[in-house]
Amino acid sequence: MAGKARVHELAKELGVTSKEVLARLNEQGEFVKSASSTVEAPVARRLRESFGGGKAAEGAAKAPAKAAAKGDAKTAAKGDVKAPDKALDAALDNAIKAGGNGEAAAPPAQPGGTATTPAAQATPEAPARPGPAAARPSAPAPGQPKPPAPGQPPRPGATPGPRPGPAPKPAARTPRVGNNPFSSAQPVDRPIPRPVPRPGAPRPGAPRPGASPGNMPPRPGGVGGPGRPARPGAPRPGGGRPGGPGGRDGGGGNYRGGGVGASPGGGGGFRGRPGGGGGGRPGQRGGAAGAFGRPGGAPRRGRKSKRQKRQEYDSMQAPVVGGVRLPHGNGETIRLARGASLSDFAEKIDANPASLVQALFNLGEMVTATQSVGDETLELLGSEMNYNVQVVSPEDEDRELLESFDLTYGEDEGTEEDLQTRPPVVTVMGHVDHGKTRLLDTIRKANVREAEAGGITQHIGAYQVTVEHDGVERPITFIDTPGHEAFTAMRARGAKATDIAILVVAADDGVMPQTVEAINHAQAADVPIVVAVNKIDVEGADPQKIRGQLTEYGLVPEEFGGDTMFVDISAKQGTNIDQLLEAVLLTADAALDLRANPDMEAQGVAIEAHLDRGRGPVATVLIQRGTLRVGDSIVAGDAYGRVRRMVDEHGDDVEEALPSRPVQVIGFTSVPGAGDNLLVVDEDRIARQIADKRSARKRNALAARSRKRISLEDLDSALKETSQLNLILKGDNAGTVEALEEALMGIQIDDEVALRVIDRGVGGITETNVNLASASDAVIIGFNVRAEGKATELANREGVEIRYYSVIYQAIDEIEKALRGMLKPIYEENQLGRAEIRAIFRSSKVGIIAGCMITSGVVRRNAKARLLRDNVVVSENLTINSLRREKDDVTEVREGFECGMTLGYSDIKEGDVIESYELVQKERT
């Protein structure tokens, strides 16, 4: 039917009942209500195919099949080489008479191994077939005699006998008119012949069925030599190309119509290949026609581009790291910031971060793509891929960051004429309690020492004092550094920011560890040293001894022929203070060129910073070059802001600060770190961008430093329970917090306990700190600060411990004791006594009772015991559950007495020995 069809009409056409049609439609997934319902043309076509085309098609298919069978029989009987053409003509005539739209079933395979092609679609306008041409002999199969050449009589026995062909397979169905539901030309209720299986398999690469366009008639072949006869094997499905002179099979569509020289049969295959047209792999199917006239079969594989070939070659040459193929470098240098992640590394080398993660995992390192990775890991991974990974130092990274904003730090702008003389910056260094702050108090005529907790300096201070020298008032800037061992970083910062160092040594105490450390800091910064031998008024003072000790460290006095100035002073009595200041100025004038440009943008260093309740973040800044003014946009480390106010050491407001001038700057949005460089920029936007990038870099570096590396070999031990003490540090200024953190992280106890600082900050303890401590099970350490507002109440409710300290070494000692208390205890075995089993008694209530004689020591109830048999341990970790002496329960039995005991163990024999012991906990150090 051309369009839709009703179910009862289809049933009548197919010769079945409507119920059978409805059932078949339901099997195909088409749910139709009744026999009067209509179905679409594609559904009707599939239904006809499922029923085999109906009775009319069966009748139409039988006639050509019989004719083809008769033709095959005659061919086999007569052995005429023209028989295939006659059989083909008969099949075509029968198909046209049957009205099957030119379609006819393919004849079965001939017994002699000659296969015929299926009848193609014919049209009334098809041209007349030319006479059959002389057939060429087919190529012999392996193992068969070669057929005689044309024109020669066959030799006896040379003709191959009949050979059974392969099992018939269903042929690939060719598209017919009406298969396309979108086509306007639909057939009008014409029976469709049932496809007949054809032997053999299609030849790979042959034209697919229905590949020729529509119902075009076959083109006649050109005039040429004799056609090639069909070779043994399966027919080649579909139409071939038009036959040329002496050429191959011709014909368009599904009809292998031949021109002059076209072969009559459909034999396929290349010459000399056994099996003919079916000569592919066994069981290989031929390609089917595509939908709506599109050529079917597998798509053509296009030629690869140069880029694809290059990518394949690079992937083949890529190194395999840990079983993962990674990009291959050419030895180029990859610059990565400290604390970079694998994603940063992958972005530099254009690789997949997941492959780097897998490679490191196979190498024994477990990290994620966004996790900060240590420098050694990055360098190892880069060397495996032939990359030279260079981890940029924080100084270089900060310089590159400033250069991206067209800024520089550490250089004076302008010419020599722009440079002006500036005051010297002097740092007072030395061992704790040797009189550094008392010396500065004497110079400033102040009393800073009494304000410090414990009498030791825990802050770094900066002051400017005017001294008269040769009748001229000359300012000198002093920086006071702590002498306690915990403040190494502060002393290092003071040495870097100074011009001259005053080394204070107590005449009665001598050279101490922090004295040596101060010498090393000053020499590393290439700073001249003036030695002040203090406490010469104290009993037992020996200044000459101090000079001899310092000679060992390269500080040779001038009276010994050296170049180091020594001044004997008494800070408490004020003795020789003027001589010390004169020595400082002489050293500055003789050895240093102290000049700076005051007309440039200010640059300096934040010596100290703290959070003031009323003023906010306050930073003590030492201006090194340029002039800092109120209203300037500044950035120091990861803090930025605008100068709202400047205060000197006396508390007076200052409008501008010249080089070597220490001032307190108010206006930062956050507390800068101690030792951060201060820089004046043009806009607040630039300052904010620089601070944000520095903050991100600082977080990455901190994460990389705090991450504990766990290898696969150490995974088992890492998964075991490890005690960890989490701390939150809050202090009154940034330098103290930094020093406290470094001192705490330097505590070395054991691998079983670990110390982790999860947060640090400047200012009072807030509710946010308490919530973080509650979530992470941490202890809050407050150094010279207290809890704010409702933080104390929240801490009591959440069970968070807050410890307050004002002296740094007290905090260090208590944290160290807490870490030691977290160590797992060690138990030492203490032998009590031995008992020999003399008799065994059995009781229904208590079980087996061992009658023993105490041979040595004492045996106690509830003590641990082990059972020995012939001096071999039979059972370990037993407990003496009950102990009796005659009829009385006793707690212990001494040597030489008999007793009865139960061990909760039944495998005991006479002669066994019970060894009693106890475990004593031993304190770990």
UniProtKB/Swiss-Prot annotation:
A single Gene Ontology CC term: cytosol
Basic and acidic residues: bias regions: 69-84
Renumbered residue ranges of the record's region G5: 570-572
Spans annotated as G2: 455-459
Region of interest called G3, as start-end residue ranges on this chain: 480-483
Region (G4): 534-537
Compartment(s) of residence: Cytoplasm
Pfam families linked to this entry: EF-G_D2, GTP_EFTU, IF-2, IF2_N
UniProt feature, compositional bias: Pro residues: 139-169, 193-207
Keywords: Cytoplasm, GTP-binding, Initiation factor, Nucleotide-binding, Protein biosynthesis
Protein purpose: One of the essential components for the initiation of protein synthesis. Protects formylmethionyl-tRNA from spontaneous hydrolysis and promotes its binding to the 30S ribosomal subunits. Also involved in the hydrolysis of GTP during the formation of the 70S ribosomal complex.
HAMAP family in alphabetical order: IF_2_B (MF_00100_B)
Name used for this protein in its record: Translation initiation factor IF-2
Source species of the chain: Mycolicibacterium paratuberculosis (strain ATCC BAA-968 / K-10)
Lineage per the UniProt record: Bacteria, Bacillati, Actinomycetota, Actinomycetes, Mycobacteriales
